[in-house]
């Protein structure tokens, strides 16, 4: 039986509380760049970054892949069933405390096992939610978001809200209903929808419009129920182009924004964007962040990175300073993430199987984003790119360009202007110069 909250559980015995020691430190269990109380642009690093630990990769993943068995050595995994669920809560909050992580996130099936019926499943969930609530009461950690796992169980083989089976649609609705109740009880600042099975494998047996309509109906029902129970957290939808489905409906930021606007959901949802999902969609992470930002729909981030040589969702910990800098540049330009945060939807490699590797990995990710924050803030403060962009588009601030932006031009006037204009002169975009400046800031700030 897992020990009670009051007992001295110590799953990470070799790890003390991780503190900031600075870049000269050689201690692998210390922050080199993440100084939670350092003030940058009027806010502390902790306030800017709002780090969150993902329950699924950190406490439930066992290292199984399609070619091999589990490798992870977890001191809580000798328990079974509900005892295992309780032990994971103990391990989670020990790690949250040692990393001083302000937030965490989970799927419903991460924290409690399914029972033989929906009623039994909900009872299991209630027990663990009660335990988590007790631990949260005695700590400073908050729930960034929770969500429903509607992709693992075989009942979701054809999807959840987009299933061809109305019984499955009803089950999914019941599961999200419970998820929203859990969000309210635990004070989740957001609720996430990720439709891993919401898509299709072939159009030969798919009514695409009907499935999209049903998905929208489902989302509206969720909005209505949140209002009914007075849950006020931000709804987030997470794009991904494929895996496990061949074609997922919320392919990328642009596709998801179009869906939200088409079905009148854009006032209720923002986007939870993941770096590895961006690369799977053929985009850079900063592209997805910019696309959401300019539409006013950037809500939260799943912080990770994909392997450039692999074509699937590798969910590596984010250590690429180039990427973290450009991500934080977009987040700062957005005025922050509001109720969102940087959730480490990342897993240690299968060969990094010892418990301490979980801590090393989170330190690496937190330091990488802390460094990215400082560089991005300095880039914005110095107007490195803003001045270049302003100069590049200056032709639209006067003359015919100003007439275009003010709506005073039409095809007739533009044709006349083009006929009279004898010369068109373009200027270099100077991409290489800008990349060199970016490298200089990353190395020197």
UniProtKB/Swiss-Prot annotation:
Superkingdom of the source species:
Bacteria
Intracellular or extracellular location(s): Cytoplasm
Supply one GO molecular-function term.
magnesium ion binding
Identify which residues the record assigns to the active site.
107, 110
Statement: the UniProt record of this protein carries the keyword Nucleus? no
Q: What class of enzyme is it?
A: isomerase
Cofactor binding mode, per the note? Binds 2 magnesium ions per subunit.
> What catalytic activity does the UniProt entry give for this protein?
alpha-D-xylose = alpha-D-xylulofuranose
Listed GO cellular component terms? Answer: cytoplasm
Which PROSITE patterns does the entry mention? XYLOSE_ISOMERASE
| Sequence positions that bind Mg(2+) 2 | 274, 277, 313, 315
Tell me which Gene3D superfamilies the record gives: Divalent-metal-dependent TIM barrel enzymes
Q: What is its EC number?
A: 5.3.1.5
Q: Single Gene Ontology BP term?
A: D-xylose metabolic process
Name its co-factor(s): Mg(2+)
Where is this protein chiefly located?
cytoplasm
Q: Which residues bind Mg(2+) 1?
A: 238, 274, 302, 345
Assigned keywords, A-Z: Carbohydrate metabolism, Cytoplasm, Isomerase, Magnesium, Metal-binding, Xylose metabolism
Complexes and interactors: Homotetramer.
Which PANTHER family did the record assign? PTHR48408, XYLOSE ISOMERASE
**HAMAP family in alphabetical order:** Xylose_isom_A
What does the similarity note say? Belongs to the xylose isomerase family.
What is this protein's record name? Xylose isomerase
Q: From which source organism is this entry?
A: Bacillus spizizenii (strain ATCC 23059 / NRRL B-14472 / W23) (Bacillus subtilis subsp. spizizenii)
- Gene that codes for this? xylA
């Amino acid at each position: 039986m897992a020990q009670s909250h009051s007992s001295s559980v110590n799953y990470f015995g070799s790890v003390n509380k991780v503190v900031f020691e600075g870049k000269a430190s050689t201690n692998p269990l210390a922050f080199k760049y993440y100084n939670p109380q350092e003030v940058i642009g009027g806010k502390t690093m902790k306030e800017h970054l709002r780090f969150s630990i993902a329950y699924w990769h950190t406490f439930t993943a066992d290292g199984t892949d399609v070619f091999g068995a589990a490798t992870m050595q977890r001191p809580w995994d000798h328990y079974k069933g509900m005892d295992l669920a309780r032990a994971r809560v103990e391990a989670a909050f020990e790690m949250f405390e040692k990393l001083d992580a302000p937030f965490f996130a989970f799927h419903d099936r991460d924290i409690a096992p399914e029972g033989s019926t929906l009623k039994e499943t909900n009872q299991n969930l209630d027990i663990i939610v009660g335990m988590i609530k007790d631990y949260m009461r005695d700590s400073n950690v908050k729930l960034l978001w929770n969500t429903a796992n509607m992709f693992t169980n075989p009942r979701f083989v054809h999807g959840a809200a987009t299933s061809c089976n109305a019984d499955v649609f009803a089950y999914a609705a019941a599961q999200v209903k419970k998820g929203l109740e859990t969000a309210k009880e635990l004070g989740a600042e957001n609720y996430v929808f990720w439709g891993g099975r919401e898509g299709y494998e072939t159009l030969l047996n798919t009514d695409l419009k009907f499935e999209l309509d049903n998905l929208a109906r489902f989302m509206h029902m969720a909005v209505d129920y949140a209002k009914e129970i007075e849950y006020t957290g931000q709804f987030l939808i997470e794009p991904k182009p494929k895996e496990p489905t061949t074609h997922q409906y919320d392919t990328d930021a642009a596709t998801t924004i179009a869906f939200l606007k088409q079905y009148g959901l854009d006032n209720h949802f923002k986007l939870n964007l993941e770096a590895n999902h961006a690369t799977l969609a053929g985009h850079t992470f900063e592209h997805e962040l910019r696309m959401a930002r300019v539409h006013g729909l950037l809500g939260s981030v799943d912080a990770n990175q994909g392997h450039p040589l692999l074509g699937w969702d590798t969910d590596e910990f984010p250590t690429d300073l180039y990427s973290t800098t450009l991500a934080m540049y977009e987040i700062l330009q957005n005025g922050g993430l509001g109720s969102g945060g940087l959730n480490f939807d990342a897993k240690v490699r299968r060969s990094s199987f010892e418990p301490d590797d979980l801590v090393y990995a989170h330190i690496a990710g937190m330091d990488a984003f802390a460094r990215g924050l400082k560089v991005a803030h300095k880039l914005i403060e110095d107007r490195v790119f803003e001045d270049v962009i302003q100069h590049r588009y200056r032709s639209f601030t006067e003359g015919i360009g100003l007439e275009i932006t003010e709506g005073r031009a039409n095809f007739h006037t533009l044709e006349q202007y083009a006929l009279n204009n004898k010369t068109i002169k373009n200027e270099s975009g100077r991409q290489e110069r800008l990349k060199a400046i970016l490298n200089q800031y990353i190395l020197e700030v």
